Structures are given as structure tokens and as C-alpha cells.
Amino acid sequence: MYHRNSAPPPPGWSGGYPPPQSQWPPHSYQYPPYPPQGPPPPPAHSYSPPPTYGNYPSPYSTPPPHSPSPYQHPQHGHSRSWTNPSLPPRPPRESQSFGKGAPSNYRFQYSECTGRRRALLIGINYIGQPNQLRGCINDVTNMSTFLHERFGYRREDMVILTDDQKNPMSVPTKINILRAMQWLVKDAQPNDSLFIHFSGHGGRTPDLDGDEEDGYDDVIYPVDYRVAGHIVDDEMHNIMVRPLQPGVRLTAIFDSCHSGTALDLPYVYSTQGILKEPNLAKEAAQDLFSALASYGKGDLSGVAMTAIGFLKKAAIGDSARQRTVMTKTSPADVVMFSGSKDTQTSADTFQDGEARGALSWAFIKSQKQRPNQSYLQLLNSIRAELEGKYTQKPQLSCSHPLDVNLLFVM
């Protein structure tokens, strides 16, 4: 997708490993000024900057009301889910130790997801622009209905940003997206359940703070990215993950290219439920092949440069992972399903008579067909829906070590 250069991302957070937060911290994020030469507003509207999130209208646009949700909050008289002991166990109420790789005595808290619910849904088709998409707005419509009917999210607690709306505050410009992200997490309390869904273009930009193993930050593109620039994963992490208290749940669905670590969550899990480590062995094999090719051509300097390059890459990759674990781990309960690995693109698909994003479609379908799955089961069922149709491989990542056999809740 796009790899447009824009203003450099914000400097990396150098505050070290964050302590668990007992109260809502002061937010240091400053709103960026809206570009003076932005895209023209929709007809019959004169754009004025949105108010601060304290007066944020919720929702920006409300879909037609549905019948009352059949969803009921689960009871917690036992550790198993609902009344069926064969279902995956619910998350434990006790605080959990981070274990290996984390500072001693540092703990996190799973969310029971029994408190307030809020959702931010962003769908951008980039109407009239190069590389226009077709299914992103449909994704938001379908996700809104699914959240309401399956998980009990109220329509009035959803903010929806799509680029087909006439209200300028409902258009997914960079400033609207950033302010909506702040609205999403404002005053969040333990056991609250927050949800963000982004369907649109994603890309990569050179990493400037050394926290990425591959040397690139993931970015998403607002509708006005040509003027306002992209939004970097470091920025999204600082706004939506860093302020959260222990026990607050944030579920993220990023259906975009190169979205594997779009929130900079340090714990990434395979379909076997194993915590992934950087694949330096594969890179070593690729670099060894290059070295042998140089040797065969008599290019000894090429052999030396390739060997030095691999050693440097391995050192940087290991250092980046340690930095991410030490600075991006959170005592909150943040879980993300992303449409593809950092190096992959995500696809539009055509399902049930309309264009959709592949991950958004698979996430909803797999849960409708089989409710009450574990995290690992859900990841594998999403992968199964896409297998053989697309090359992308959805990813599961978390802000803390995750017991992938627990019931997926949100």
C-alpha cells in the first residue's frame, strides 16, 4: 500500500518501564494543528475544528436503532464460561505476573469486561483518490451491528468515522481520528471494555526510535493523509494503550496492510499459542546465501559486508525486541487482531453480495458460526476462513503475556 513520507513520527517514549497506574494519568498528547490546506469539506458544510474530547459528541453518526440486544453479561459464580463447563475458562480475577523478560514484581490484570462499553469504528474507502477501496465503509456498518447484537455495545456509545458522511466531524481526517482515539480511552475504569476497528490503507515508515525489530514503524492513512500525513504506531500506542489502568480492556481490529504491530503490542502469538521470537535464523540463511553468491563471483568484500550486515541486523533486532517489551508492555488488558503480518498486504474481498475487508469479514463470521471460543481458537478460525483464498496471515498480539486458552471476551 502507500509508503508516503510525511512529518517524522513523534520521538520515542523514553520514560522507561511504566509502573501500574492507580489513577488516570495526565495526558501529555497535544492536538496537532489542522493543516490550513486540507481537503475541501463536504458540500453545504463549513469546516470548524472539532471540540476537545471532553465535549465529544457521541456518536458522530448513529446507525438506525435495532431491537434491544439479546446479550446478557455472564455470571461469575464459577471459573468456566456461562453455564457450560466445556467452554474455555473465563479470565482470572487475580492480578497476574508478567514473568520472564519483565521487571520483578510487575503485574497485569485481565478484564472481566462487565463495565462500560465504548467503540470507535473507522472505515475509509478514499473516495475519489488513487487506490480507492470498496469494502471499508461496509466493514464499519457490519461491525457496528455485530458489536450491538453479540456483545451488547450500545449505539450511543459508538463513534463512527467514514468518508461518505456529510458531517465534517464524522469524516476520518487525521485530527478527527486522533481526537476520537482520546475519547475512546478517556476515564476508562477496570473491567470497562473498549473497542477500536480500523479498515483502510496501512503502510510502513522508517523507525526513528529503535523499537521495531524490522526497522519500520507501522502506519495508518487517514482520508487526508496527502496533506496531514499518516498516523504512526508509536502515536497510537501512546494515546490508547499507555494511559490505561490495570483491568481495562481494549480490543483492536486493524484490517489494513502491514498492520501486524499497529499498536506496538510486544507479545505476538502463533497459531499454536506460542510466543513468537524474531526469526533471525531465517534471515541468517538469506544472508548466508547472499554471502555464498558473492564468494562465487570472487567478491570477497561482498562476503564481508553481508556478514557484517547480518550481525548488525541480529543485534538491532534483539535490542528492539527488548526495548519493546520493557517500554510497551502494559498492566492493562489490550488485545489486537491484525489483518496481516508487518510485511504483508491485506485484501478486499466480496462476500454475501458486498465488498468487505477480509479480516473484518472473517472476524465476524467465525464468531457467528462458533461463539465462545478461546483466543487461540478464534485466531485459528479466522485464519481458516482466509486460508486458500488470500496470502495474508492475521496476527494476534497482546500488551501482556496472554493465556491463549482463556475465553475470548470483550
Curated annotation (Swiss-Prot):
One MF term in the entry's GO annotations: cysteine-type endopeptidase activity
Region listing for Disordered, in residue ranges: 1-106
Any one Gene Ontology cellular component term annotated for this protein: cytoplasm
Catalytic residues (positions): 201, 257
Catalytic activity, EC: 3.4.22.-
Alphabetized Gene3D superfamilies for the sequence: 3.40.50.12660
GO biological process: apoptotic process; proteolysis
Transmembrane segments: none
Pfam families: Peptidase_C14
Swiss-Prot/TrEMBL keywords: Apoptosis, Hydrolase, Protease, Thiol protease, Zymogen
Domain of life: Eukaryota
Composition bias, Pro residues: 7-23, 32-52
Family that this chain belongs to: Belongs to the peptidase C14B family.
PANTHER family: METACASPASE (EUROFUNG), METACASPASE-4
Function description: Involved in cell death (apoptosis).
Name recorded for this polypeptide: Metacaspase-1B
Gene name linked to the record: casB
